[in-house]
Amino acid sequence: MGEVRVVGIRVEQPQNQPVLLLREANGDRYLPIWIGQSEAAAIALEQQGVEPPRPLTHDLIRDLIAALGHSLKEVRIVDLQEGTFYADLIFDRNIKVSARPSDSVAIALRVGVPIYVEEAVLAQAGLLIPDESDEEATTAVREDEVEKFKEFLDSVSPDDFKAT
């Protein structure tokens, strides 16, 4: 199981479908996960540091976890079946709750816990976008990688990632 970082939310055209883009913390694979509009907004708002005047659903969940005296330890994306990703919220006291990856990531960002992906999921749905240079990865190269990936996302559909 490897740790991933949230790259951000992209929008697949022409369907206008949001895609959550994760990248291995210690690798070059990206994991695209198609998600709903409201979850995409929740993730984007948190990444941008926007504080809503009233708690959104994922803020409420964060607050409930704390109010009930528990702590979220990590988020795990654990499976991919027929194009659907599955995740678990891992709490203290060995409590595990199944959740959608989009909700799990939105909560993880708010709580500040790591996100992990099972190797089998990365092997099945991860995309390798190699660096153009073996030298130090510069900001320009990383931006170019993301731009190439955006172009790739524009050319694929969720059906391309369904298991055969």
From Swiss-Prot:
Coiled coil location: none
Protein name: Uncharacterized protein Rv1829
Domain called BFN: residue spans: 1-129
GO molecular function annotation: nuclease activity
GO cellular component annotations of the record: peptidoglycan-based cell wall; plasma membrane
SUPFAM superfamilies associated with the record: Hypothetical protein TM0160
Organism field: Mycobacterium tuberculosis (strain ATCC 25618 / H37Rv)
Lineage per the UniProt record: Bacteria, Bacillati, Actinomycetota, Actinomycetes, Mycobacteriales
PANTHER family from the UniProt entry: VON HIPPEL-LINDAU DISEASE TUMOR SUPPRESSOR (PTHR15160:SF1), VON HIPPEL-LINDAU PROTEIN (PTHR15160)
